[in-house]
């Protein structure tokens, strides 16, 4: 079994969470991590488990307009935000809609502002809905991690790593494999 973590990140927070999730997941399953712009069909075809994530923008997944707004924020003279190199490309929404041969298993995660979920919404819920509609089976409930400013809180990174570890165990169980048998 192999896992692929595909993420969209504007300012680095979702990227950090994707790496932490992959670290936890790799304790049970060999795992690769790719930004959405680099996740091609070959990488997808090699995976049995897709872990897809992105930032929450305006109550859900990013859109072209919200990504353009993030680019403007980072470019403002008073801004201390650093844009990820792949930030202005297509997001996780566009990637999922165009991806062929999705793995049979998936998990979804997002990052969001440190506010009540009913105020911020959740990209992970929408990601999960798309992947279920495309025929994949959800392994665990979506993971949501707080992303304050341009530097995700260390406790959230730890939570993401633990979520990845639990995901690995659940994915193996879904496949009828024990963690010790790897």
What do the predicted segments below correspond to?
Residues 36-134:
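Helix-loop-strand module that forms the ligand-binding subsite of alpha/beta enzymes
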Residues 132-182:
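Glycine-rich phosphate/pyrophosphate-binding loop and the adjoining helix
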Residues 28-37:
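Short gly/ser/thr-rich secondary-structure transition/capping motifs
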């Amino acid at each position: 079994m192999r896992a692929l973590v595909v993420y969209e990140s504007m300012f680095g927070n979702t990227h950090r969470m994707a790496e932490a999730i992959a670290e936890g997941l790799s304790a049970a399953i060999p795992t690769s991590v790719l930004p959405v712009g680099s996740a091609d069909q070959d990488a997808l075809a090699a995976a049995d488990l897709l872990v897809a994530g992105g930032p929450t923008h305006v109550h859900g997944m990013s859109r072209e307009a919200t990504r353009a707004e993030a680019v403007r924020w980072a470019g403002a003279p008073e801004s201390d935000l650093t844009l990820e190199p792949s930030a202005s490309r297509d997001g996780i929404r566009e990637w999922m809609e165009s991806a062929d041969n999705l793995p049979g298993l998936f998990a979804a995660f997002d990052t969001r502002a440190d506010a009540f979920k009913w105020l911020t919404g959740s990209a992970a819920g929408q990601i999960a809905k798309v992947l279920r509609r495309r025929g994949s089976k959800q392994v665990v409930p979506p993971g949501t991690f707080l992303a304050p400013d341009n530097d995700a809180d260390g406790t959230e990174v730890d939570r993401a790593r633990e979520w990845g570890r639990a995901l690995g165990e659940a994915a193996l169980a879904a496949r009828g494999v024990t963690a010790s048998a790897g």
